[in-house]
A protein has these predicted regions:
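Short alpha-helical
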Residues: 29, 60, 102, 123-124, ...
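Helix N-cap/coil-helix junction residues
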Residues: 43-45, 71, 134, 165-166
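Active-site neighborhood of HAD-like aspartate-dependent phosphohydrolases
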Residues: 2-51
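Short, acidic loop-to-helix structural element flanking the phosphoryl-transfer center
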Residues: 2-11, 88-116, 122, 126, ...
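Metal-dependent phosphoesterase signature
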Residues: 44-45, 65-102, 110
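Substrate-recognition "cap/lid" segment bordering the active-site pocket of phosphatases
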Residues: 93-95, 115, 121-179
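Helix-loop "lid/cap" segments that line or gate small-molecule binding pockets
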Residues: 37-38, 57-72, 128, 160-161
Length: 180
């Protein structure tokens, strides 16, 4: 009799993981980063900001801050400030989601290649993976900086599958939000 994991992996050629909210418990960090950033720029934080940003690539989030919230900083400056605010938390504070390490180990035992597909920056994604000592599981790491169209557009997943050398239809994807 097959267990739940074996059933999920049956017929799959690869597994693709989101990072924030899926492998690591970091979503609260981003609410705090946004609050500090908006305060520094004299802007209020709407109650539904996190919902509106859900699934956007980091560059799309910068566009949202420029075009909707009205912050004039260039996207590169926004990204640098967001990275600065989040970096130490990613290095020292953020923990793995319960069960994530077990899943990675089980998938590795099945010898299925794994990839990351995250909306985050490469610097923060790699910091998180390194801090949790899990970067070695992944053959491919796709970030929001690698794509023009962020999630929920399927391109980041399709490109991760292509780089793994598998058909996207034969991949299992772990995400924490429908927009992802």
């Amino acid at each position: 009799m097959k267990n739940d994991i074996e059933r999920l992996l049956e017929g799959k050629e690869a597994v693709i993981f989101d990072v924030d909210g899926t492998l690591i418990d970091s979503m609260g960090v981003w609410e705090e980063v946004d609050r500090i950033y908006l305060t520094r720029h004299g802007k209020p934080m709407s109650e539904d900001l996190q919902r509106k940003l859900a699934g956007l690539s980091i560059l799309q989030a910068a566009d949202y801050f420029r075009n909707v919230i009205g912050i004039d900083d260039p996207p590169e400056k926004m990204l640098a400030e967001w990275n600065e605010l989040a970096f130490e938390q990613y290095r020292h504070e953020i923990q793995m989601k319960p069960g994530a390490a077990k899943w990675l180990s089980l998938i590795e035992e099945k010898e299925l290649p794994m990839a990351v597909a995250t909306s985050n920056t490469r610097k923060l994604a790699m910091t998180a993976l390194h801090a949790q000592d899990i970067e070695h599981y992944f053959r491919v790491i796709m970030t929001g900086e690698d794509v023009v169209r962020g999630k929920p557009d399927p391109f980041v997943y399709q490109e991760a599958a292509r780089r793994l050398g598998v058909n996207p239809k034969n991949c299992l994807v772990f995400e924490d939000i429908p927009e992802g």
